[in-house]
Structures are given as C-alpha cells and as structure tokens.
C-alpha cells in the first residue's frame, strides 16, 4: 500500500508516518510561538486513517506545552472551501487565535484565505502534503509550514520493491518503509 496503514498480509507499505508527521508539525508550530498560544485544528474527514493519525500526533505534540490551548478542533474534510468557511466561523468566536494546524494543505489554504480576509495575517498556518500551492504559500510567507508527504517517492519505492520481488522473490526487510520528510 502507498500511504495507508498496511493490513497484516500486506507485502509492503511506503509513505509517511502520519502520527509522527502530526507530532512534528505541532512541535514546530508550538516552538515557533514560544510554547504558548491558542490553536485551531482543522481535521480531515471522519474515519480517514491518515487524518486520524495526524490529528492524534498533533494533539500529543501540543499537549506537551502547558501554555498551548486548543480552542477548537473541527473537520474541514480536506477541502479548501471548507477550510475557509470553518476558519471564518471559528475566528469570529476566537478572535485571538495564534495558529491553525490543518490536517492537509487544501484546508490550510482555505484557512489562509479566511485569515487574510479578516486581516489576521500574523496567525501561523500549517498544513500537510507539500502541495505546490502550499509550498508557494510558505515561500510567500502566508503559511508557516507544510509537511511534504512525497507521494511520488512513495510510489517509486513501492514499484521498485514490487519489481524486485517479481524478478527474484526478494521481500523487503520490514512491512513499512517510512519517508523521512520534514516540516
């Protein structure tokens, strides 16, 4: 499998450790804010394993800081339009938010749109996937970070192992090959 949790009989899983990526992103954002601040979390679709694992990692990472408060955690379904509308609604209630961590880049980019429209340009926004739009937003300074999940690299490695297995029946040493990407 590529990117999703592997079943017991899976030959190989390549991709990012979603829990670890959520944890790493949360720590990076919390450290940037000096270990204190109010956070909004934009969750992924209910039941999506990558969204659940990222969210668990985010919550664990942020819980390590006494000065961090998660003021809201709500789904944006990995959609830019929902990221924007959810953020618009939440910033009316939480006008002093310091950061938004979205469980994917599309939701994060929607949050950026909402925050820009509200002239809240100092709010840190983080996402996941390393999309072109999010990478450009980081370069432009409208997003703090995106976590590159490298789907091309994951697919390439999975195919290389499959070809090797078909050619000489060599199995990988483990069932999961994580990609060391960075926030």
Give the positions of each predicted feature.
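Extracellular/periplasmic ligand-binding modules, especially the Venus flytrap/periplasmic-binding
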Residues: 104-112, 150-167
């Amino acid at each position: 499998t590529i990117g999703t949790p592997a079943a017991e009989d899976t030959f190989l899983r390549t991709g990012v450790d979603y829990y670890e990526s959520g944890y790493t992103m949360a720590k990076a954002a919390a450290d940037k804010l000096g270990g204190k601040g109010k956070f909004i979390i934009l969750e992924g679709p209910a039941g999506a394993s990558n969204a659940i694992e990222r969210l668990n990692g985010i919550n664990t990472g942020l819980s390590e800081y006494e000065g961090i408060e998660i003021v809201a955690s709500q789904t944006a379904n990995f959609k830019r339009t929902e990221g924007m509308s959810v953020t618009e609604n939440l910033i009316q209630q939480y006008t002093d938010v310091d950061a938004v961590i979205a469980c994917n880049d599309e939701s994060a980019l929607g949050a950026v749109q909402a925050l820009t429209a509200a002239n809240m340009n100092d709010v840190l926004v983080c996402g996941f996937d390393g999309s072109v739009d999010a990478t450009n937003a980081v370069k432009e300074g409208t997003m703090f970070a995106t976590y590159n999940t490298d789907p091309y690299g994951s697919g390439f490695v999975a195919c290389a192992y499959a070809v090797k297995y078909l050619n000489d029946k060599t199995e990988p040493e483990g069932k999961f090959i994580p990609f060391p990407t960075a926030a």
